[in-house]
Amino acid sequence: MKTTTLIKSLLLTYAVGIFTTTAQADEKTEAAVTAAKEWLAQVDAKEYKKSWQEAARFFKDKVTEANWNEMVSSVRKPVGEVKSRELVGAQFTTTLPGGPEGEYVVIQFKTNFADKPDSVETITPMKDDKGTWRVSGYFIK
């Protein structure tokens, strides 16, 4: 009887731990997706300076504002305006190749651009030291 009670107690503790961890990751993922959508709205509106200013320190240390403006306009201009964007997935992680340890969410959107339908945008917000999600990477495939 004691063994059964102990096993049930351990399973319940384990299940509560998984649920809490999953719920915390879901909250972080949701906040990061919101931040990514807001940032993408700036890029969609060609507010490149503002998007650079709102990006993560890691991003800004790698790309100057002038380089960002040139890079993003050269990538976005040929694909045209966004016609639709649908969230495909978001994955929380604490490590990324080439990035500092921290909290990241790798987000993918299926995006239909006017001149490049069926594209995949990958955007990676990271949490800064003040708890704000800021974009640290952006790619279109």
Predicted regions and their residues:
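Second-shell loop/turn segments in exported
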Residues: A25-D26, K37-L40, A55-K60, K110-N112
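Short solvent-exposed beta->alpha transition segments
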Residues: V33-A35, K49-G102
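Short, low-complexity N-terminal intrinsically disordered segments enriched in polar/charged residues
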Residues: T3-T4, L12, T20-E47
